[in-house]
Amino acid sequence: MPLPQAVRTPLAGGIEAVSIADDSQPVSRISIVWPVGQADVPDCNALALMMPMLSEGTLSMSGADIADILEFNGAWMKTDIGRHTTILTLFLLNKTAERIFPLLADILLHPAFPPDALERLREKLIAQTRLRQHKVKELARQLSNRMIFGVGAPAARITSAEGFKAVSREELVDLHRRLILSTRPTLYLAGAVNGKIEQMAMTMMDSFGSPTDKALAANVVPAPAMQTSSRCMEVVADSLQTAVRIAIPTIGPSHPDYYSLQTAVFALGGHFGSRLMSNIREDKGYTYGISAMMLTTRETSDIIIHCETDNRFTDSVLNETEVEIARLASRPMGDDELKIVRHTAHSGLLATLDSPFTVIDNYIVEQAVGIPAASGFIRRQENVLAASAEKIQEMAEKYLLGTPRAIALAGNTGSDQAVSQEQ
């Protein structure tokens, strides 16, 4: 089953609209995606503050007024920041769209960045950041990125309490001018997108004008080649658990083996009955859950294996992970297991067709990481349905067995190279 084809419409100023129409529900989703994210801006802390501040007040209304209008008209808005994307998403009812689109334009074009709201949001983000820095899963992810990309690399940037404290209102105003007003976004429309909705959305986007020399651009720095395996630990003295994150650099979407390798990784740890779950969770009881996935970004493609475990079992989890990789690479799986892998992987793919919102997300990912949405979806299906035990074994042997890997641990096993949180 193919991914529904999106309709692409050029707008003024070089902006493109990408739409998926489905009128089964009278709801539309508008996503405005700027091709710049945390790795690209001068200060990622300023970006994390600026985006939610957009709805805290404009030159003509307060943040409370904005919240009341959205709620009264059955609309809600959120912002998301990725490594190379900044996204504003708005869900709205078609019957109230005429009242919502002018509000959205005002939010985007004329934010006031009121000082009192800025201080409230600053304190909220500082508290959230400090809480996040006590979670071993997050610390292992951050350490893994430093190991893959290097300390200080754009792709390894994180927000911090001290960083939030240092951001001034003037920085937010400047970043808004350079990102929202000067950098060309893409408009994604999904749901009950009719001619009226399209026209209102496109009229709103026309008010942005053309990109200027103040525009920001993506700062993609490829990850350096990993020559040997490494293992580092972020020590969390009072932690009862250790987060394990194994990153194995691998091939990208342009490689002919890419989609076949995805299926092999799925068999290893991509579903509840996978090799890793069956052994490390069900048989050994070392963790409540362990997973493996392919994580592709503009900088690199990596196979990521991650879980949390009691400190005592950290080495056992690592050992059993290698056992399962070796077993997958050493002999073909049985017919029953192969059927489960095919069926579960295919069901997961088809689930992305459930709504126009999940469909349009495929096209947003295409912009974010460069994986072709429509053709990539077909190739993933073809490789899942044609998967053989021999091919899965071949992929595991070729790309998983003995390949250099970065093992990032965060917890309190006390036996690894310590890495400070400030690194």
Please describe what each predicted stretch is:
Residues 1-68, 89, 102, 173-279, ...:
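His/Glu-rich zincin catalytic helix
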Residues 10, 65-216, 252, 282-423:
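Charge-rich, well-structured scaffold segments of protease-associated domains
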